[in-house]
């Protein structure tokens, strides 16, 4: 390289001398003097080159962009450095030819040097790292502050973000209130995050999106709660499904439809009847502002079997039903599809029943009379006994052996001369 610089210097600085030196001895002497001067200059350049080290900030002029998408930079020392695209920007798809033009000035930090037998010393430079260093030096936020961040990438452990040129990290556990299985949904998005830890000396910046998300959710809840009231029917979108129910988005806030509130029919798994993204009408059952919970019902917005029952059944109706369950206190009888009423143990028979299972079992067909129906409470009281003939009242003698009313009535129907009380009761009188 020194030889190349000599040739360049001779050709550019002393063209007349190079042309005429063969014609004059004086010119040869002049060349000797200038050669010595140039050697001293080259030595100075080489000495300056030796002084460039890793970590130094250098400024150079863009000479070319090579086939590897690297910016070739001419340094003030007369040497060259290269800035790979990956060290120019975080944008993996950047094309330096679209960003730079020949002659542009580039400031970068030296991250390594490479020695080549032919080319001398070349430096690997990074503009991106210099920008980050400057950003750290000019920090305008502190721990606890909320900042705007750009998500650069999603990795297994969390999100890599850029905050005003400073590289930061949001751990997966701090991305949201609940576990996020796919972090890629945040790539290239702008987020707000709270500064949890900041260590400029080690270029360490830890942030939490969850803390800010919780504040945003609280604000959203307050706004949504102010617009809702218990008993109101609103439209929502199924946001996610679980084994115990479906979460419905009511406009930025989710409410829960418990599996028991999805349908009037029995639902084993919410995914059997609902799909994420479904539009559904829901009735608001409860609003818990303290815990930020909203209880919803889909089935409450639909006409169910009890509505049909109210139309078809009235107190006094006699129906045939099927025994579904037998309990100690009575038997549940299905009188319409999905509609069961209770026959209390006292309403099973005119005879004394200790346990309903003595006379009834699941699957039995029985005749019942409706004693009372309350559709709003989904309750029907039934009776089997009411359909039985009432037995004649048995009048028995008292425990002390006295005559029963039946005996006395029979006596009164007899002629006074037919018999005496002694004839009737014998020695019991």
From Swiss-Prot:
Keywords: Repeat, Ribonucleoprotein, Ribosomal protein, RNA-binding. The keyword Repeat applies. Residues 382-399 have a biased composition (Basic and acidic residues). CDD domains: S1_RPS1_repeat_ec1_hs1, S1_RPS1_repeat_ec2_hs2, S1_RPS1_repeat_ec3, S1_RPS1_repeat_hs4. The keyword Repeat applies. GO terms for molecular function: mRNA binding; structural constituent of ribosome. Binds mRNA; thus facilitating recognition of the initiation point. It is needed to translate mRNA with a short Shine-Dalgarno (SD) purine-rich sequence. GO terms for biological process: translation. The lineage of its organism: Bacteria, Bacillati, Bacillota, Bacilli, Lactobacillales. It comes from Leuconostoc lactis. Residues 382-412 are annotated as: Disordered. It comes from the Bacteria. Residues 55-128, 144-211, 231-299, 316-385 form the S1 motif domain. GO terms for cellular component: ribonucleoprotein complex; ribosome. This is Small ribosomal subunit protein bS1. Belongs to the bacterial ribosomal protein bS1 family. PANTHER family: 30S RIBOSOMAL PROTEIN S1. The gene is rps1.
């Amino acid at each position: 390289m020194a030889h190349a610089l000599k040739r360049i210097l001779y050709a550019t600085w002393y063209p007349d001398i190079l042309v005429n030196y063969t014609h004059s001895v004086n010119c040869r002497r002049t060349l000797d003097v200038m050669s010595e001067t140039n050697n001293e200059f080259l030595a100075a350049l080489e000495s300056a080159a030796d002084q460039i080290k890793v970590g130094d900030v250098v400024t150079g002029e863009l000479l070319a962009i090579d086939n590897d998408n690297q910016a070739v930079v001419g340094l003030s020392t007369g040497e060259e450095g290269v800035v790979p695209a990956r060290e120019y920007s975080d944008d993996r798809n950047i094309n330096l030819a679209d960003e730079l033009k020949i002659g542009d000035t580039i400031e970068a930090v030296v991250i390594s040097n490479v020695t080549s037998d032919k080319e001398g010393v070349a430096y690997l430079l990074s503009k991106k790292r210099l920008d980050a260093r400057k950003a750290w030096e000019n920090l305008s936020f502190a721990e606890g502050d909320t900042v705007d961040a750009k998500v650069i990438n999603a990795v297994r452990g969390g999100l890599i973000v850029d905050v005003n040129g400073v590289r930061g990290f949001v751990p997966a556990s701090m991305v949201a209130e609940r576990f996020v299985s796919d972090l890629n949904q945040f790539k290239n998005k702008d987020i707000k995050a709270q500064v949890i830890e900041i260590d400029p000396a080690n270029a360490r910046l830890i942030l939490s999106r969850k803390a800010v998300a919780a504040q945003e959710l609280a604000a959203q809840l307050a706004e949504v709660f102010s617009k809702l009231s218990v008993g109101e029917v609103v439209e929502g979108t199924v946001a996610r499904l679980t084994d115990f129910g479906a979460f419905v988005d009511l406009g930025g806030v989710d409410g829960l439809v418990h599996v028991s509130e999805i349908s009037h029919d029995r639902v084993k798994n919410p995914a059997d009847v609902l799909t994420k993204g479904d539009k559904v009408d829901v009735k608001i059952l409860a609003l818990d502002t303290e815990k930020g919970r909203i209880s919803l019902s889909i089935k409450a917005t639909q006409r169910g079997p009890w509505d049909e029952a109210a139309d078809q059944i009235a107190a006094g109706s006699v129906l045939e039903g099927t025994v579904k369950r037998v309990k100690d206190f009575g038997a549940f009888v299905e009188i319409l599809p999905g509609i069961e009423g209770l026959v209390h143990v006292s309403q099973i028979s005119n005879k004394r029943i200790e346990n309903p299972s003595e006379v009834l079992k699941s699957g039995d067909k029985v005749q019942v009379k409706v004693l009372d129906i309350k559709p709003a409470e989904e309750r029907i009281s039934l009776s089997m006994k009411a359909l039985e003939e009432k037995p004649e009242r048995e009048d028995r003698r008292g425990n002390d052996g006295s005559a029963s009313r039946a005996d006395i009535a029979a006596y009164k129907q007899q002629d006074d001369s037919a018999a005496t009380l002694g004839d009737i009761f014998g020695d019991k009188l």
